[in-house]
Every structure is written in structure tokens, then in C-alpha cells.
A protein has these predicted regions:
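Aromatic-lined substrate-binding rim segments of carbohydrate-active enzymes
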Residues: 1-6, 144
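Hydrophobic faces of well-ordered beta-strands that scaffold small-molecule active sites
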Residues: 6-8, 126
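Short "lid" loop at the C-terminus of a central beta-strand within the Rossmann-like core
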Residues: 12-14
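Alpha-amylase-like alpha-glycosidases and glucanotransferases acting on alpha-linked glucans and related
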Residues: 16-176
Length: 176
């Protein structure tokens, strides 16, 4: 009627550390049940709004002495602990308010595709922030580095994967 159109700004690389998917679909995220660095501590404020989970940033975030690569989630009922990696493009510090999606998981890829399609049905224009990190070469470089390379994200070298295995797990560029 007035010629106004809305655009959506979507970040398909990661979610917020307190996003619904973090609680409802923990398998969508790059996480592990131990801290990537034994010296990391998580004694700061609980940032969770979910009554079932506690979410804490690594303490060095607050005193600015290190760039924490994970945050800790603790289930208040079972005591289960997960260390979830923050989003990162490998060029600067981790994005400490984010949780990194695991694109090696085909269920995650499909969930993101469906979310993109949902947004596309509601907005004529979509801006994708951090979209370059969805390319296979960046997923490999950042999160599943080749053996012996160390990778661009601290704490991920032990998750290295040879090219053949990586290509088997992500056979094609899923986002095209």
C-alpha cells in the first residue's frame, strides 16, 4: 500500500548462546563434554533464561585476559555439562555471544535450510551475515582441520579430519 518492504538479517552460521536451538537441539552445535583448555573456569553470572539450563561464559571473557572459545552449559536437573564452541570466522576473536552450529551434522544442515526457506517465505530480501563461513572449505579450515595443521580455532586440532572423510560427511556445498 505504501511501497514499504522489509528485509531480514539472518546469520546462518551460529545462534545466540541463549537461543532456543541451544536448549532444544544441542546436537546441532559443536560441543564436547570436556573443556578444551583445563585452565578455563566458568564462575561468572548465569546467562540462561531457561529454567533447565545454566549458561556461563569463560572467566577470561570478563577480565579480558584471553579469548574464550567455549561457553559452559549445565543441566540443572541431571548435572550434564557441555562446552559449546562460540562462532568464529578465524580472522579475529571468537564471537562470545554465539553458539557455533555443526555443519558436519546433516540434521543441522537440513534445519538451517528449512529456517532459511521459512525466512524467505516471509521476507522479499534476506541479508546473510557471516555467510562465507558456510562454504565447505571454511567449515573444514575452522572446525575440522586437516591432520597436522592445527586449524584456525584453538581447541579444534584434536577434531582433525582427512579430506576424504570430510568430503564423505559433507559431500556437496549444501547452501547452494
Amino acid at each position: 500500500k505504501r511501497g514499504i518492504r522489509l528485509a531480514s538479517d539472518m546469520v546462518p552460521n551460529h545462534t545466540g548462546i541463549d537461543g532456543n536451538w541451544v536448549y532444544e537441539h544441542p546436537e546441532y552445535f559443536i560441543s564436547q563434554d570436556y573443556s578444551p583448555f583445563p585452565s578455563y573456569t566458568y564462575n561468572g553470572p548465569d546467562l540462561s533464561t531457561n529454567p533447565d539450563w545454566e549458561v556461563k561464559l569463560e572467566d577470561h571473557y570478563y577480565d579480558r585476559t584471553d579469548a574464550a572459545v567455549t561457553f559452559r552449559m549445565r543441566n540443572r536437573h541431571t548435572g550434564e555439562i557441555r562446552y559449546v564452541f562460540h562462532g568464529n570466522d578465524g580472522t579475529t576473536m571468537p564471537w562470545n555471544d554465539t553458539a557455533q552450529l555443526d555443519y558436519l551434522n546433516p540434521v543441522t544442515r537440513e534445519a538451517v535450510i528449512q529456517k532459511i526457506l521459512h525466512v524467505a517465505r516471509n521476507f522479499p530480501i534476506i541479508r546473510f551475515d557471516a555467510a562465507m563461513t558456510l562454504a565447505k572449505r571454511h567449515i573444514e579450515r575452522l572446525w575440522y582441520p586437516k591432520p597436522g595443521t592445527g586449524g584456525d580455532i584453538a581447541g579444534r586440532a584434536e577434531h582433525s579430519m582427512d579430506e576424504r572423510e570430510f568430503n564423505k560427511r559433507i559431500p556437496e556445498e549444501f547452501w547452494r
